[in-house]
């Protein structure tokens, strides 16, 4: 696991280099930010890295990164590959990473990666409303995008959750139209988005934080940011809950010494 973490750290360093060069703002997100605050680096059992960017900056990064990334790394997006998740990743091509719900019927790169989540302004609605909405959207997306075998139940699920998904989207569009969007920010709601909002002033202006002995961009107020996500985030979970996401990790398909020959 440690070899995989160090390879992911090198991907993050490359992203940081490109972002600094082109003035693209990003920040550590999710479990990666939690690891930085609580452990000074990776959560010991964590096997991925999460960062966030505003939607505009993520689009700029998507344009620039393919020309800037070092050899052996690739930018993976829903537009470039038929991916399982509709988010952007920087993948390492000399590794193999398999999650329990990986779809081997789809042809996409499955190396170690850094997730890049796009963030947008959110309407000024209550946090409870946003969380209920996010969970409903997440469930609908999950049902609609997993493989179905033909049956009356599957047909019913597609129609029911399809209609519910469209209804939720219309409610969310109405919230954007009727409320100001100057207080909160969060990730674009996708299959793993749960509608957790952050105040803009706890994200911007960005700060820096130490992660594995190096400094990376972080939210302005990591405590408030992590409290939104995890509440009592400094409490280490019991051993039985300290689980990796992957079911199989191969940090190097070809030994690095052979690659350099």
Give residue spans per PLM region.
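Conserved catalytic core of two-metal-ion nucleotidyltransferases
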Residues: 1-22, 65-124, 142-149, 153-229, ...
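Short, conserved charged micro-motifs
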Residues: 59-63
